[in-house]
Amino acid sequence: MVLINRVNIQPEELPLLYHVNSMDVYNLLQDIGSSKIIIDLRTKEQYEKNHIRTSVNIPPPPSTTPLYENGEIKEFNLSKYIGSNVTAKHWNLIFQKLIVYSDKPFLYNIDELEKTISTTTITTTATTTTTTTTTSNSIGSDQDIIKSLKVSDWDKVVLRHFLLKKKKTKVIIYQGGFDQFQKDYSFMCNPSSSPSSSSGGGGGSQLYPSEIIKDFLYLGGAENAGNRQQLINLKITHLVNMAGELDDVYPHLYKYYRANLDDRPKANIYEHFEPVIQFINDCKKQGGRVLIHCAMGISRSTTVVLAYLMKEDHMTYSDAFTFCKQKRSCINPNFGFVKQLKDYQQHLTLEWEKQEKLKKQQQQTLNINNNNTGIPLSKKLQLDVSDPLSNSSPSSPLISSTLPIPETPPAIILKNEVASPCPIKTTTSSTTINNKGQQQDKAQEEKDSIFSYADKQEKMTHPTLHSPIELPQSSL
């Protein structure tokens, strides 16, 4: 038997508050897996003009509030004020998540908030046992009375109140502001004059599909696939129908991939992984958006979404599942599909290992080729000047007016012998001495004297840069 020291077991420390972006708020609105409340802290006029659907308004107190003077309210009971909204009255007892937004980002110091909340909690606990009172600036007094509330600090004050009173409720703030959300998801906003404040952009009160990849991949059920207005709002161009019992509703309007698959553990969903991934990538290349669905958006459609994430983003099954569940909390592939996904992970791992091994081999071959390209300098020079008029090689230097340095010292030349290291052409030119007597004298001089190869070079003439080297013709 293994004994566990319970003294060392500490509960996971949760963050004080959470931050979300526009897509997260959109997905939270579709989440049926947890209870939530959305709080709008803007003015009543702004809220009535337009707001995120299903949100409730907790506006700053109006100037008609008792003890209101110069933008401040004396002796303000914040808990009672929030409780005047029936939906928000018991928010910390009913809801698992509280999402709060305003018309601008929240300005706060997290260290200051933690210190204030910690101090207020200790003071409140001491008050219940010693009947001491808290400071005038405390939010957490027995009667939740704020001695002096500045209306301009409304967002900050309410946020501190929620953090202080949250219990097990997660406090989530959306920093983008209403205007940003309306820009990204206008169909998820409604004016108060709308017949149903929970309806959304022609989609009625029905939930939209979850957004797995921003502006590209959506996961949902049959109701989403059959709702033309939702497809228009989301700009869907392709659909993947993983349910054999469902017909393609708009085959004349959208491109479909149909799987005809039952939600049974023994059903072969593996064979659809590669074709579906190819279909999704084709949609991406065309700049489209794809909705992947089955009957409920829980098992079959989720499985192929996970397969796509595993291959395209090199995720493990576990990582892909966690990522997808953060976007859609109700996903739950059956155990047979989970096994096939894990088999697919092994297949992908082998493929990645082969690719990595091939890359290493190619790199090693490249390194060897680079190391074996060393050629003696003298041979390179000979290669470069073997054809002085050719410049086909971009690395060849311009033709110089001097000959390349020979690899070995020049040989001694007697009479009409030509040194082999230097490619010398003997031609007749306009500069040749025409006087026969001079030619004979020069020939006699060649017979009687021995000169080195270097001295002979000095006697050579070069009429032009590209003309061949000329030697005087001997009469012998």
From Swiss-Prot:
Its EC number is 3.1.3.16, 3.1.3.48. Residues 425-476 are annotated as: Disordered. One of its GO terms (cellular component) is cytoplasm. The keyword Hydrolase applies. InterPro entries: Dual-sp_phosphatase_cat-dom (IPR000340), Prot-tyrosine_phosphatase-like (IPR029021), Rhodanese-like_dom (IPR001763), Rhodanese-like_dom_sf (IPR036873), Tyr_Pase_AS (IPR016130), Tyr_Pase_cat (IPR003595), Tyr_Pase_dom (IPR000387), TYR_PHOSPHATASE_DUAL_dom (IPR020422). Residues 442-461 have a biased composition (Basic and acidic residues). Residues 208-350 form the Tyrosine-protein phosphatase domain. Transmembrane segments: none annotated. Residues 425-436 have a biased composition (Low complexity). Residues 32-190 form the Rhodanese domain. GO terms for molecular function: MAP kinase tyrosine phosphatase activity; MAP kinase tyrosine/serine/threonine phosphatase activity; phosphoprotein phosphatase activity; protein serine/threonine phosphatase activity; protein tyrosine/threonine phosphatase activity. It catalyses: O-phospho-L-tyrosyl-[protein] + H2O = L-tyrosyl-[protein] + phosphate; O-phospho-L-seryl-[protein] + H2O = L-seryl-[protein] + phosphate; O-phospho-L-threonyl-[protein] + H2O = L-threonyl-[protein] + phosphate. Keywords: Hydrolase, Protein phosphatase. Has a dual specificity toward Ser/Thr and Tyr-containing proteins. PANTHER family: DUAL SPECIFICITY PROTEIN PHOSPHATASE, PROTEIN-TYROSINE-PHOSPHATASE-RELATED. Belongs to the protein-tyrosine phosphatase family. Non-receptor class dual specificity subfamily. This is Probable rhodanese domain-containing dual specificity protein phosphatase.
